[in-house]
Amino acid sequence: MITMSSFKYAGLIISIIISLISCTHNKNYPTAFQPELAKAEAMMYRYPDSALHILQGIQPDIPSENEQYATWALLMTQAQYKNQIEQSDSLINIAYSYFINQDNAQRKALALYYKGILRHESHHAEDALSFYLEAATEIEKTNDYQLGFLINSEVGLMYLYRKLNDYAMEYFEKAHHNAELSDNQTYIAFSFIYIARAFSQKKQYNKAIEYYEKAIKIGQVNNYPTILASAMNETSFLFLKTGENKKALQYAKDCIKIKKTDQRIFSLGDTYRYLKMYDSAYFYLNQACLSPNIHTARSAYQALYYISQHYCPVKVDK
């Protein structure tokens, strides 16, 4: 039976817990909005839309609490990026200017990372790489393994784009190490895909396929269609390189079943072209030509041009 004394006892316990939380100081959060900022950051990776909603409800003071405003500005930058909201660099500049001079490696790394992201998006690749590399140094001082994965992946991708394959591999391996420590299966799968791309660019196709297959396995076990289709699509191309044509065609078909996109329609059509199955190639490449993505459409037209050198589709009179 619940008595009045039971309610008083429960109330006392709750009061003690709240008092303990209030007295516990986390150096990552200024005191005024500590609960809201902590809650938003805790939700950032899994529920970025909810994190954004919380941050939008906070009205920090500007200049009386510099740390408070810098923290809010940094998390708001992160939330907007994760929700694919276009933004200027005004908020990240506030966060960067504050945290770059503080003894907080996690905040410094996060600010440097998003400075790099926004510089990269505005086509300043050298600046972006410089920020990423500095962020990579700072993140090694922390246990934020999810951020460590993201930072090292960006560095690796920039080196891979420049065909600096050994440097790319070094950072992809760091990204994989961080992904494993974070136990984030999505990040682990993408780290395998990135390592596979580096092996592919080094023309070590069998090693690349080995790592793509690891990503595919994670996609299958965890029902991650985006990862599964992406890895299978890229592996299909490598199977053509290694002469495993049946596997190449099957993977290309499976990608369409998982999720049909213009790029995957093109890939299937181009696989048929490579195998000299021109009727099927013509069918899918014509669809890909209608893509609003100029790169996909251009590739499809180019593939059709190559086909025209060997094949003329039969037109039926009506």
Predicted regions, residues:
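Bacterial N-terminal signal peptides
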Residues: 11-19
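Bacterial N-terminal signal peptides that target proteins for export
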Residues: 2-11
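A "functional boundary" signal
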Residues: 5, 20-318
